[in-house]
């Protein structure tokens, strides 16, 4: 198992995303651990002590502060630890093109401006109205996701929220139906999530295996149950008249990009 340490002198989200993108190419053979706020030489020393005995590891660093970044690189060379400095080369090239000295301001991307507060508000909105907890959020949502269970509605809502988009999701369950409010809002902001039946069966079976569920939950992944749900979902989505997105073998980021493009959001 390879451990990728995402190291930053700020919150570490950028380093973590880069590390996770790399780790995802190796499925269960790589994990990511985020280590934020490495702001001093002492912090670097503590970091090295923590990871130097790791048999298979590497560092993905987005440290901005020059002396801290260089010291970390030096210590990694001494300890034979692989390190990738993600931002250093990019900043150097940008500096050359612009003929301007960089600010070297850790966390500048996450300054508490209007965009930051919009993201926080959207994330709180997504958690409050997740999985039909409260339908009152429908009219205030920027995006409404409608789909069967295990079509990535919740993680997609959270991803969109991180972009400052208020998203709410409505599960399609034959025994429950959908709220009438769904037919009263602008259908341009509603997106139906569809998926290949075989993939959905596989996803649900894996979930049952993970939690060792039996009895009533067996129906959850049965062919007949999923066929019933697909027929119900098709009926509802046709009635709404909304746009649909096939999420089969599609990454959450790709689905989010499609939605953002449809909404005209960059």
UniProtKB/Swiss-Prot annotation:
Q: Which GO terms describe its molecular function?
A: ADP binding; ATP binding; phosphotransferase activity, phosphate group as acceptor; protein serine/threonine kinase activity
Enzyme Commission code:
2.7.11.32, 2.7.4.27
Give yes or no: UniProt keyword Nucleotide-binding. yes
Pfam families assigned to the protein according to its UniProt record, in alphabetical order: Kinase-PPPase
InterPro entries membership: Kinase-pyrophosphorylase, PPDK_reg
- Which top EC class is given? transferase
Coiled-coil intervals: none
Q: Which domain of life is it from?
A: Bacteria
Keywords of the record, alphabetical order, are: Kinase, Nucleotide-binding, Serine/threonine-protein kinase, Transferase
Plastid found in the keyword field: no
Catalyses:
N(tele)-phospho-L-histidyl/L-threonyl-[pyruvate, phosphate dikinase] + ADP = N(tele)-phospho-L-histidyl/O-phospho-L-threonyl-[pyruvate, phosphate dikinase] + AMP + H(+); N(tele)-phospho-L-histidyl/O-phospho-L-threonyl-[pyruvate, phosphate dikinase] + phosphate + H(+) = N(tele)-phospho-L-histidyl/L-threonyl-[pyruvate, phosphate dikinase] + diphosphate
Q: Which residues cross the membrane?
A: none
Binding residues annotated for ADP, in chain numbering:
147-154
Which family is this sequence assigned to? Belongs to the pyruvate, phosphate/water dikinase regulatory protein family. PDRP subfamily.
Task: Relate the protein's function as given in its record.
Answer: Bifunctional serine/threonine kinase and phosphorylase involved in the regulation of the pyruvate, phosphate dikinase (PPDK) by catalyzing its phosphorylation/dephosphorylation.
UniProt protein name: Putative pyruvate, phosphate dikinase regulatory protein
Q: Which organism is it from?
A: Clostridium perfringens (strain SM101 / Type A)
